[in-house]
Amino acid sequence: MEEECRVLSIQSHVIRGYVGNRAATFPLQVLGFEIDAVNSVQFSNHTGYAHWKGQVLNSDELQELYEGLRLNNMNKYDYVLTGYTRDKSFLAMVVDIVQELKQQNPRLVYVCDPVLGDKWDGEGSMYVPEDLLPVYKEKVVPLADIITPNQFEAELLSGRKIHSQEEALRVMDMLHSMGPDTVVITSSDLPSPQGSNYLIVLGSQRRRNPAGSVVMERIRMDIRKVDAVFVGTGDLFAAMLLAWTHKHPNNLKVACEKTVSTLHHVLQRTIQCAKAQAGEGVRPSPMQLELRMVQSKRDIEDPEIVVQATVL
């Protein structure tokens, strides 16, 4: 019998669509993980629509929920997964919870998507309050084992700009020195020999071999861009990286290939369905571009590798 692997996922929840916990829970369950989800917000839909309604969980409410788990001795976890957070006190409470869970299980792996902002047309901007950045740098990242920043977030966390692959590798080394053993820059605008229609994923993993010396594995993936705005892809990426690094703990190349290939299959299915719904020459709406997660169940379970990683 396969050993149970339990994940505490603290992320947003939407009634309709797939972001945050909704983008992470189903795929992880399909891959055999037990998911305990704390919904940091409960919204009708993601905020890319014209309207949304809902409630936001505050740090006291998060503490109360965790206290219920603790009192029942249900705070033994193998993984913690966190994503988008807007509130400084909520983030500080997440740090307290992860620290306590690591005391309960020193082998717990904390997977953090440090959602801070992104680049549009080469210009970066933050979409969370700026006072969250020092909390991420000083408390969250040092506690994390796996982080999945985009290029702009990696630049913010390291205080360094990235203009080349060499600079990206140096930034990843800086992020390793802050704590995490695995750093994956999930998208960057570095040049690709395949043309301007590609974005670059870079990964770096620090491991100890049986002799005790440190081994580094670095990978690069050139991924063709899709001409559409999807929401929830970063949440799905972090969840799939959790799953595939668990299943391939000493092979970042395979873990990233399976993660990126899963996203490829989900996005291709989504864009095909969205275009069919929108009709010829009409740009699909946010509702039509919601990730086709359930329809992609087989691809999530056993993704055909369609994007190869290069070992650097």
Swiss-Prot record:
Pathway: Cofactor metabolism; pyridoxal 5'-phosphate salvage; pyridoxal 5'-phosphate from pyridoxal: step 1/1; Cofactor metabolism; pyridoxal 5'-phosphate salvage; pyridoxine 5'-phosphate from pyridoxine: step 1/1; Cofactor metabolism; pyridoxal 5'-phosphate salvage; pyridoxamine 5'-phosphate from pyridoxamine: step 1/1. Changing D235N: 2-fold decrease in pyridoxal kinase activity and pyridoxal affinity. Ubiquitous. Highly expressed in testis. It catalyses: pyridoxal + ATP = pyridoxal 5'-phosphate + ADP + H(+); pyridoxamine + ATP = pyridoxamine 5'-phosphate + ADP + H(+); pyridoxine + ATP = pyridoxine 5'-phosphate + ADP + H(+). Pyridoxal binds at S12, T47. Its main location: cytoplasm. CDD domains: pyridoxal_pyridoxamine_kinase (cd01173). One of its GO terms (cellular component) is secretory granule lumen. It comes from the Eukaryota. Pfam families: Phos_pyr_kin. Optimum pH is 5.5-6.0. Na(+) binds at D113, T148, T186. Homodimer. Belongs to the pyridoxine kinase family. This is Pyridoxal kinase. It comes from Homo sapiens (Human). The lineage of its organism: Eukaryota, Metazoa, Chordata, Craniata, Vertebrata.
